[in-house]
Amino acid sequence: AIEDPGYPDARNIFSNRTDSLTPAPIDQYGLVVGDHLRNFDYIYTTPSHQCPTGVTMPLSRREQLLQLANESNVVIIEDDFESENNFEGHPIPALKSLDQHNRVIYVGSLSKSMAPGLRIGYIVAAKELIAELRALRRLMIRHPSTFIQRSLSLFISLGHNDAQLKRLGDAQKERSALIMDALARYAPQCRVTPMTGGGSCWVKLPDGVSALALAEHAKSRGVLIEPGDVFFNQSAGNGHFVRLGFQSISASVIDAGVAQFAQALGDMQKRPSD
């Protein structure tokens, strides 16, 4: 089972290896946990900042999911990308940290918090599984750069990573406040999902507005947005969501960018329906 909407690259990877991939619904608290998940072998989830909505799974639901996994012999793949990128409240313990029965495979990366070009990730799982994964990795790449790994280890041990996360959190808090305020002023007809971290926001467009068409029109105004269709298992009927990224954008241009987005949206709403 995989979240729907969810991370498209994970869905594509799994789809290449199985015909039994099933979309699982989410709500304002992330993956919906219930009896519908009991018959799966694996559940893939992004609990810290759900991709693409950005919502955070609360502790009570994490405990509920772990209980279901224990009772039903299910393995959870916890993709905890952007877990450090919080600007509101305190981080919730990872599923893996709550796992008492080795039901969770924890996957993380430093590409979001450090640099996209730093292709270093990590997995926390049972030692037997790690041994198998190391053997499989060797068939693809002998090993990641030892120099980069040692440099990163030193960077973390000296406390520089903690300082980097603090700077990142402060910057994203400022930018998220700016984009939320601008959307409320310029595009009140949109519904924006509340967020507590991450570098993007999930926006539901007014009825009748195509995300794909809006993306093309906004591009002509110098604004790049990501249509939400790609995040759904079936794009049909789900073409009215967009994801707006702000992590790599200067705070000084966010207001003007949202104003242009709203102008493009207004143009689309004036167009006659097909």
Which residues are covered by each model-predicted region?
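Conserved glycine-rich beta-strand-loop-beta hairpin in the small C-terminal domain of fold type I
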Residues: 6, 153, 170-180, 191-204, ...
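Active-site PLP attachment segment
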Residues: 97-132, 144
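Residue-level detector of anion-binding/catalytic polar loops
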Residues: 20, 75, 224
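Conserved Walker B
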Residues: 80-82
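PLP-dependent enzyme catalytic core of the Aspartate aminotransferase-like
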Residues: 220, 235-274
